[in-house]
Amino acid sequence: LRREEERSLWLHRALLGPLLRDPDKVLAHARANIIRWRGAHRPDGMTQAWLSEWEALLDSGVDAVAEVLVSRAPHAVDLRTNSPFAGVLDENERQAVHRSFRRHWARDHADA
């Protein structure tokens, strides 16, 4: 994965904890984001298609969502670029994941 895709993967992995601890809250948060974002994007744009796909995933349940959050499959990578989970992690959690990711990337990609 490219750096930004790997960073997104790490952030989405961090969502597994909240998702498994309180799935109703996390899925409701994602649904609220989707509703809000639908009005902010062109009705005929690609973002609407991604949001519709996320809605279907949310309707499929926690297991389907968790699978996409951690998958390296190209389609999952693309889905995460339009993730409805903004705001689930608080700023301290996000920053901690970013710091951990930077250390990981520097260590594992030092020769690249």
How should these model regions be labeled?
Residues 1-57:
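The feature represents the first ordered module of a protein
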Residues 45-93:
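Amphipathic protein-protein interaction modules
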Residues 92-112:
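Long, highly charged low-complexity segments enriched in Glu/Asp and Lys/Arg with interspersed Ser/Thr
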